[in-house]
């Protein structure tokens, strides 16, 4: 039986592409309403409901830096606090966590990056 993968940001851009392209994975796309990453109780509820083995974290803001700077508290909440909550839940429930990000973590400068 395939492992169940909880996808946060289930209505976002990346999730839409994943829905279209996926043929082999057992994915559960959770909406913000169903899986609010800012609330540990919401995360506990969805974990208990669907019992995933993996969390694919695609929720968050992925806009140019000038948009983030206009609403820095929302950016911090979603991209830092929400991710920290998922790390806590994954650790508590012994789940694997895969985190997706964008090139905007590099201050929006263009170019090729290496880490």
Task: Give, region by region, the residue ranges found by the protein language model.
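Glycine/Thr-rich phosphate-binding loops of Rossmann-like dinucleotide-binding domains
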Residues: 15, 37, 64-66, 107-108
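N-terminal Rossmann NAD(P)H-binding glycine-rich loop of SDR-like oxidoreductase domains
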Residues: 2-23
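Conserved Rossmann-fold NAD(P)-dependent oxidoreductase catalytic core, especially the SDR/UDP-sugar
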Residues: 4, 84-115
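Adenosine-cofactor binding site in Rossmann-like domains, unifying the SAM/SAH pocket
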Residues: 23-45
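SDR active-site strand-loop-helix element
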Residues: 8, 30, 55-59, 97-103, ...
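NAD(P)H-binding glycine-rich loop region in Rossmannoid oxidoreductase-like domains
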Residues: 40-78
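Conserved internal alpha-helix in NAD(P)-dependent oxidoreductase domains
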Residues: 73, 77-84, 92
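Short, well-ordered alpha-helices that flank and scaffold nucleotide-derived cofactor binding pockets
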Residues: 16, 20-24, 45-48, 84, ...
């Amino acid at each position: 039986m395939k492992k169940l993968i909880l996808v946060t940001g289930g209505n976002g851009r990346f999730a839409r592409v994943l829905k279209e392209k996926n043929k082999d994975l057992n994915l559960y796309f959770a909406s913000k309403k169903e899986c609010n990453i800012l609330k540990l109780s919401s995360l506990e509820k969805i974990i208990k409901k669907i019992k995933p083995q993996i969390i694919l974290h695609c929720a968050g803001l992925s806009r140019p830096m000038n948009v983030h700077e206009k609403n820095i508290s929302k950016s911090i909440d979603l991209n830092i606090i929400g991710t920290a909550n998922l790390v806590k839940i994954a650790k508590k429930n012994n789940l694997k966590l895969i985190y997706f990000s964008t090139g905007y973590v590099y201050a929006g400068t263009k170019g090729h990056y290496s880490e």
